[in-house]
């Protein structure tokens, strides 16, 4: 099915192309209810940070020099990876040989939940799963991924393949020759190892970063993580795949049900963020915050203040882009405690908060509520309307 609207990846690409006086690279379908004339990045404050980001993008695209790291952070829509993968595909096709040197991933399916779409995972043995959106889980240390898997099973393995489940003609292929496993053993006696072409490799351990780094003589698209012995436990917090090449890297960080406070509960978020040192962060967190019965704009903004403070400690020059919420539904309890769904009117409050934060932090804003209109306008225009989801 054709996309209802261009993705933010194409939006960024088009804005960048406009600055180069180049034509659009992808046609846009015409829908009467969509406000295409409003489909652009807003700058309520100063645009200097984004201009600096675009200059760095110029160096990568035109000179083949340097790296650009972009992180898209959110909830279930980012964990699913569909939006982020389309963003990645569009952005990496504005030129040639642009696929960057890093790919931060987390093997969600080993914990019994869904993986993003741009890589594949298989696992064996028993793994316990914790995520930042569940308060009772936050006694387990989590990092940038917002999730963790833990095992005491000597037969436990996790295999990761850096290939999209449903690739299209634009989907780039990512190969790597370096792997960094982020994790720890609470019993301090379990070490993860990696299988590479039939050989067992031991990594270099960094106690400060809590990482195990493995380097390969050749490029590959897959690894298997396992344990030679299991006298205790091991918790995996994330995996960084690298190839040392210049280009554009797009990292998706998303957990089902996550809100801004969910990421603030991750003790090792800042530590792990240093590994990718983002140049641009796209904030897609807000749907789950706005679904809370006691949602307040000022609290929402203060939570973002805390998160941005962490980000700017890692990279003070990191550009920020806020995505406002779509129209959405929220669960409410009616008579006799029956659950029903109603339109969440907090979307417009999140929209205003994004504009205010855009001004405060000199950030860009992509106003989805403004450009696509209310749910009643686009409902029934695509095959997902029965689920109240726009494509």
What are these regions (language model features)?
Residues 1-28:
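Bacterial Sec-dependent N-terminal signal peptides
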Residues 73-76, 252-257, 283-288, 323-327, ...:
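Active-site-proximal beta-strand/loop segments in catalytic clefts of secreted hydrolases
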Residues 66-69, 246-249, 276-281, 315-320, ...:
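Loop/turn elements at helix/coil->beta-strand transitions in domains of secreted/extracellular proteins
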Residues 280-286, 304-312, 319-324:
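Conserved, well-ordered alpha-helix/loop/beta-strand core segments that scaffold catalytic motifs
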Residues 79-195, 204-302:
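Conserved SGNH/GDSL esterase-like catalytic core that processes O-acyl groups on lipids
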Residues 267, 328-391:
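Catalytic His-Asp segment of secreted/periplasmic serine-dependent ester chemistry enzymes
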Residues 18-59:
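Sec-dependent signal peptide cleavage junction
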Residues 45-60, 263-275, 302-310, 349-352, ...:
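Alpha-helical scaffolding within the catalytic cores
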């Amino acid at each position: 099915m054709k996309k209802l609207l261009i993705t933010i990846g194409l939006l960024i690409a088009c804005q960048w192309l406009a600055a180069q006086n180049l034509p659009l690279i992808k046609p846009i379908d015409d829908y009467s209810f969509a406000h295409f004339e409003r489909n652009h990045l807003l700058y309520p404050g100063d645009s200097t940070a984004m201009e600096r980001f675009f200059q760095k993008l110029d160096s990568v695209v035109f000179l083949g020099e340097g790296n650009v790291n972009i992180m898209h952070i959110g909830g279930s829509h980012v964990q699913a990876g569909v939006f982020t993968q389309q963003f990645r595909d569009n952005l990496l096709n504005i030129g040639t040989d642009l696929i960057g040197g890093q790919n931060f991933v987390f093997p969600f399916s080993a914990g019994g939940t869904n993986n993003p779409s741009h890589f594949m995972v298989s696992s064996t043995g028993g793994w316990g799963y914790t995520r930042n959106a569940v308060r009772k889980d936050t006694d387990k240390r989590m990092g940038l991924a917002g999730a963790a898997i833990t095992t005491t099973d000597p037969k436990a393995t996790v295999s990761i393949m850096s290939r999209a489940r449903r690739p299209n003609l634009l989907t780039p292929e990512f190969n790597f020759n370096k792997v960094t496993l982020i994790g720890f053993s609470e019993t301090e006696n379990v070490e993860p190892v990696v299988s590479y072409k039939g050989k067992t490799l031991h990594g270099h351990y960094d106690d400060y970063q809590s990482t195990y780094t493995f380097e390969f003589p050749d490029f590959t698209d897959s690894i298997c993580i396992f344990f030679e012995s299991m006298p205790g436990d091991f918790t995996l917090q994330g995996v960084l795949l690298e190839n040392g090449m210049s280009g554009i890297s797009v990292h998706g960080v998303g957990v089902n049900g996550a809100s801004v406070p969910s990421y603030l509960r991750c003790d090792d978020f800042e530590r792990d963020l240093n590994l990718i040192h983002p140049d641009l962060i796209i904030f897609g967190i807000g749907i789950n915050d706005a679904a809370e019965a006691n949602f307040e704009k000022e609290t929402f903004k203060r939570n973002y203040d805390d998160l941005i403070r962490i980000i700017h400690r890692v990279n003070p020059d990191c550009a920020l882009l806020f995505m406002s919420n779509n129209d959405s539904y929220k669960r409410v309890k009616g008579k006799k405690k029956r659950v029903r769904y109603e339109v969440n009117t907090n979307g417009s409050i999140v929209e205003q908060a994004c504009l205010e934060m855009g001004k405060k932090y000199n950030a860009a804003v992509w106003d989805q509520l403004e450009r696509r209109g209310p749910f009643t306008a686009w409902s029934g225009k695509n095959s997902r309307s029965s689920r109240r989801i726009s494509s």
